[in-house]
């Protein structure tokens, strides 16, 4: 399909008249058109369409439909029906009341074009740029970042189910492409094993029988791969994506010995991680405390404690709406600390760097405390991990905080005034060792080291990181830090809004790119809901408290909170 850019155009008179009569107070979709008209334009999506072919639906309209779809938590079919029958949607899209709308498949095709063209971020960036022009958003200030888990659209499989379903998926694809060729490679017993979905309740229960079945599946898969490698095999079958996936899965779950596939005790993890489902090979197992899931992870960064907006004549001054400014989607196994620098880089690209970024411990390490400030001018606010040495855990003895470091002389001074005699630099770690005879003669040895054949060894980071880490460990014990860090809790409300209204924690699509597009659309939808509430003068809702919790403020039950203890 081809695309010829068109102007936004005016709302048809009859559509406007009926919509105003049906919605005297307006609706979010109508206010979107009135206040943010022209947010998307056809020219933005021109690169996603060829220059020849049948004319496509106006991309700006499809983008608005996708956003409204997420605002209301609709499926593709429901969104297409809303375009066809909802008066306020026709108003937002500038359509005649008699317009027949679109087919639901058009939305899927448009999403595929966005993903193929790498234009996911454009949907959010365009809205943020408009917010900058309106004075609702600017660089600086304070932002907060947090992540939450996202379940993949596939079921979680055991190892045996995974290999069985992987082979079954390949057979389904080959049967669809060239049934005659496949019929020559398999026997009737293959249909018995793979015609039905491989599920645990259909599998044998004794371990010996399950292992025998795994070996049989391995042999079948290996035989099929060898047949596909023959010169007479049609080239279109050899290049099927599921065939490449079969090779990866067999490398992970089987060991090739003497020309046969032998079942491993557990999957052999490769650099990109263990594949858990053939229907979404990018889905990974993640674990955070007691939560275990198969899928992805989404990181949201939003503004907080926003500055006031210059009011219009006759209006009161109000703080700007809180907006999501950056979205990052990763595999579930990626740790939060690995994406901190990426988030900051993208904020810099969008000219939206904050003065202060509030994060939890997962996004922090000593190096990032330094690089965030030096590279981007950001104060990374959050608690760092505590000292894990036995001295710190016991609450007695000499942990790292008790030692002084003379960086110029490359020596460490212990609490008793003794100096280290060795200084070894290994990558980003420094080891400073004390003489054995010095520690052996020290009366404080039991509080310092358990080593009997050597002196105390102190492990350090490079100077800037080490000093930043020790300063933060001291700072995070103060009441002022706790009060500043309390701001981070507000992003939990953003997660709740995304989960309850827009299904943030359940991927609608397969694969990381499409899941990321879902999260970008969710962020745009949340921003529009917040902008709409801000335009109507509705303040953010207070944190819900149950009737029983409210009794805590009753004069008969009120207890003042205990005072915070000052840091030592």
Model-derived features with residue positions:
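Basic, short loop/linker segments at the boundary and entry of helix-turn-helix/winged-helix-like folds
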Residues: 22-67, 71, 460
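Helix-terminus loop motifs that line ligand-binding clefts
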Residues: 89-101
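N-terminal intrinsically disordered, low-complexity, charged/polar
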Residues: 1-26
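A short secondary-structure junction motif
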Residues: 39-43, 86, 90, 501
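Amphipathic alpha-helical interaction surfaces
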Residues: 68-74, 85, 89, 133
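Anion-binding and metal-coordination hotspots
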Residues: 78, 83, 97-100, 108-568
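Contiguous, well-ordered alpha-helical segments that form the cores/surfaces of helical PPI scaffolds
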Residues: 59-70, 85, 298-299, 342-345
């Amino acid at each position: 399909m081809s695309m010829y850019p068109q102007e936004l155009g005016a709302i048809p008179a009859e559509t406007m008249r009926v919509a105003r009569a049906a919605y005297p107070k307006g609706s979010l979709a109508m206010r979107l058109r009135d206040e943010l008209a022209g947010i998307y334009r056809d020219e933005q999506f021109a690169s996603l369409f060829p220059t020849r072919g049948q004319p496509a639906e106006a991309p700006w309209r499809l983008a608005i439909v996708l956003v409204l779809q997420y605002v209301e938590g609709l499926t593709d079919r429901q969104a297409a029906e809303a375009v066809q029958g909802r008066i306020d949607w026709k108003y937002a899209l500038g359509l005649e009341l008699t317009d027949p709308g679109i087919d639901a498949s058009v939305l899927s095709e448009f999403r595929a074009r966005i993903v193929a063209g790498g234009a996911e971020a454009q949907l959010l960036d365009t809205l943020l740029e408009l917010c900058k022009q309106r004075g609702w958003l600017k660089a600086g200030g304070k932002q907060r970042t947090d992540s939450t888990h996202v379940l993949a659209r596939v079921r979680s499989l055991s190892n045996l189910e995974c290999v069985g379903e992987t082979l079954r998926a390949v057979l389904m694809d080959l049967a669809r492409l060239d049934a005659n060729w496949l019929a020559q490679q398999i026997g009737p017993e293959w249909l018995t094993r793979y015609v039905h979905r491989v599920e645990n309740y259909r599998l044998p229960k004794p371990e010996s029988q399950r292992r025998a079945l795994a070996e049989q599946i391995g042999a079948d898969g290996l035989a099929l791969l060898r047949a596909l490698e023959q010169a007479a095999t049609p080239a279109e079958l050899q290049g099927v994506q599921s065939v490449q996936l079969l090779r990866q899965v067999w490398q992970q779950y089987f060991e090739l010995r003497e020309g046969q596939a032998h079942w491993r005790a557990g999957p052999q993890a490769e650099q990109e991680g263990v594949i858990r489902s053939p229907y979404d090979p990018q889905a990974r197992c993640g674990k955070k405390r007691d939560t275990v899931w198969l899928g992805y992870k989404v990181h949201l960064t939003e503004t907080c404690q926003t500055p006031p907006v210059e009011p219009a004549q006759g209006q009161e001054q109000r703080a700007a709406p809180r907006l999501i400014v950056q979205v990052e989607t990763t595999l579930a196994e990626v740790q939060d600390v690995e994406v901190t620098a990426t988030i900051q880089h993208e904020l810099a690209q969008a000219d939206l760097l904050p003065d202060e970024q509030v994060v939890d411990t997962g996004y922090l390490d000593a190096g990032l405390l330094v690089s965030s400030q030096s590279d981007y001018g950001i104060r990374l606010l959050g608690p760092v991990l505590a000292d894990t040495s036995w001295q710190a855990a016991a609450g007695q003895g000499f942990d790292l905080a008790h030692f002084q470091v003379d960086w110029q002389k490359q020596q460490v001074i212990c609490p008793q005034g003794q100096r280290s005699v060795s200084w070894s630099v290994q990558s980003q770690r420094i080891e400073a060792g004390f003489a054995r005879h010095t520690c052996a003669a020290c009366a404080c040895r039991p509080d310092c080291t358990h080593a009997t054949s050597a002196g105390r060894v102190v492990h350090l980071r490079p100077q800037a990181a080490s000093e930043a880490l020790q300063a933060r460990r001291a700072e995070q014990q103060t009441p002022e830090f706790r009060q500043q860090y309390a701001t981070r809790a507000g992003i939990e409300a953003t997660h709740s809004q995304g989960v309850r209204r827009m299904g943030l924690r359940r991927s609608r699509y397969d694969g990381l790119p499409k899941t990321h597009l879902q999260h970008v659309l969710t962020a745009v939808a949340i921003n529009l809901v917040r902008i709409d509430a801000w335009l109507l003068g509705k303040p953010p809702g207070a944190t819900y408290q149950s009737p029983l919790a409210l009794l805590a403020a009753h004069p008969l039950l009120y207890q003042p909170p205990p005072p915070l203890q000052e840091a030592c």
